[in-house]
Amino acid sequence: MTVITIAKRGLPKLTTSTSSTTTASSSSTITSVASSSSSLPLLSNSTSSSIIPSITPPSRNGNPYILDSGDMPNGTVFIVVGGIAGVIFLAILLWWVITTYSSHRLTRSVQDYESKMFSTQHTQFYGDSPYMDYPAKENFQDQVHISESDISPGNKDESVKDALVSHTNNEKPFLSNFERPLSSLVSESNRNSLFISPTGDILYKTRLSKLYQESPRLLQKPVIMTSDNVSTNSLVSTISSSSASSLDNGNEKEVGEDIRKPAKIASSPSRKLLNSPESDGSVNRNHSKGNLLVVQSKRKPTPSTYLEHMLEGKEQDE
């Protein structure tokens, strides 16, 4: 069994002391002593305080050293300077956008113009040009076809000669795709590059040969109808008939075959009819009679001369 004993306590006593110092400090001490005796605990408390004066700015009235801002808000100078700088920056940005757009537009228009003017599709090797005033077909037919009423027996050779010249002049702009240049560097019209292809001219002539072989419609044009019950269906047959009348019977077959094979003559100019002794006599007779099919021998140019002609843009005669 546990016995609890409660001791009596007296009321505490409060002791107060006040002191003033330069530092503000406050401390309160309460001491309580519990003992079996009847003495009461003691409580001690100390308080310190200090006075700080307030700072008052000087008045602007009558003071020349203080700027009077008046009614303007604070930061007016910053706002003005920032606005001017912003306007200048926006003006520069707007000018850059306008000039860039105009330059791109001008460049695009110039490129389109150059692509249309200097593209290979508008050259003489690609058929009709959009800048021509008349179609190529009508020009070809008008200059090559000859009516019978305009031809008399006396000037038959002259008419055939005119037809041949007209056909040769109109043949070059209206060739098919076989006569297209191999490359812009190999083209005769391009003199901006020093590149010279040693095989470009040979391949170009080969394409010309294929043109004559695969496009006979350029040569098979009705030209005239003779009064001797002999119908001529093409320019080649007309030339053959006019030339055959002025040749001997022994040389008629040989000359006719050479006329009907222009590809071999164009592709290999060194193979002439003058290689055989029989053809020498026929050529002399043809030259004396004014025949159109006289094949004259010509010395082949030296390589240096050939290169000079190519650089100067001169056409090589076949």
Swiss-Prot record:
- Gene Ontology CC terms: cellular bud neck; fungal-type vacuole; membrane
Polar residues compositional bias: what residue ranges?
A: 276-285
InterPro entries, sorted: PRM (IPR051009)
Q: Which residues carry this modification: Phosphoserine?
A: S129, S279, S282, S288
Cross-link type Glycyl lysine isopeptide (Lys-Gly) (interchain with G-Cter in ubiquitin), placed at: K314
> What's the protein's topology in the membrane?
Single-pass membrane protein
* UniProtKB keywords: Isopeptide bond, Membrane, Phosphoprotein, Transmembrane, Transmembrane helix, Ubl conjugation
State the coiled-coil residue ranges.
none
Cystine links in this protein are none
Task: Identify the stretch(es) annotated as Disordered.
Answer: 238-318
Segments of skewed composition (Low complexity): 238-247
Q: Where in the cell is it found?
A: Membrane
Locate the transmembrane regions by residue number: 78-98
Compositional bias segments (type: Basic and acidic residues): 250-261, 309-318
Q: Which family does it belong to?
A: Belongs to the PRM5 family.
Any idea what this protein is called?
Pheromone-regulated membrane protein 5
Protein species of origin: Saccharomyces cerevisiae (strain RM11-1a) (Baker's yeast)
| Upper classification of the organism | Eukaryota, Fungi, Dikarya, Ascomycota, Saccharomycotina
